[in-house]
Amino acid sequence: MKRRDFIKTAGGLAVAGSLGGISTVAQGCSSVPRFNMNKLGTGAGLKLSFAPYELQLRHTFTVSSYSRKTTPGVQVRIDYEGFTGYGEASMPPYLGQSVETVTAFLQKVDLSQFNDPFQMETILAYVDSLSPGDGAAKAAIDIALHDLVGKLLGVPWWRLWGLDAAKAPSTTFTIGIDTPDVVREKTRECADRFNILKVKVGLDNDKEMIRTIREVTDLPLAVDANQGWKDREEALDEIFWLKENGVVMVEQPMAKENIDD
């Protein structure tokens, strides 16, 4: 069974017995509106809209190659029969994507030709065919479409996929490169709310960053050098030292072009 067939079948079972255009299903103490599957393909097409925004960061965020006080994003929404799915495009600078490239791609997308959001493979294949790249914009549409379908069914995706929410991977809190005082402050703010912390490294104060954090917490750490270590020898020296200090994962140790090392 293909993914869209599974989703549509699951949706039909989920709303069987519903009365009128929208029914509700109790989930805990709340009622979640659900879509009448009999209306699929009979109404207007999907409506795509988007809005760029800029988040103001509480602390200046520094990595090995740049610093910033804000971070841009583009919110994507897909509307269908009174339901709305949301997605977000995140644009890492090193991937060459920006608010401008994301919005330029989204302006090409016409989802009004589709009046059944459960045709996910067809819809996403169309979106992918519009350009060879633009991963951030495509991901935002993908997320919004999944969010919409989950809301139409009144069922979260972790449940549709048969996952255990209690066993979901931990989310990290990222601590940017900064002075010891600010690093201590950031660590105190998050240490009791996360099971693992992610630390930006890749400059000449890597050990100072880790030692400062260790003054506050003994939580497991992941580090991201953002391609800041120059060669294999430097990277290995750093990695061995980091392992001795409770670091369990290293991300982007060297330049992305340096594949052989």
Summary of predicted features, one role per range:
Residues M1-K2:
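N-terminal secretory signal peptides
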Residues D5-Q27:
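N-terminal export signals
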Residues I22-H59:
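C-terminal segment of N-terminal export signals and the immediately downstream linker at the start
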Residues K39-F50, Y66, I78-D79, T84-L152:
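Metal- or metallocofactor-binding catalytic centers and their adjacent structured scaffolds
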Residues T60-S65:
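Short, P/G- and charge-enriched loop/turn segments at secondary-structure junctions
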Residues K69-V74:
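A short, compositionally biased
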Residues W157-D261:
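Metal-dependent enolase-superfamily TIM-barrel catalytic cores that perform enediolate-based chemistry
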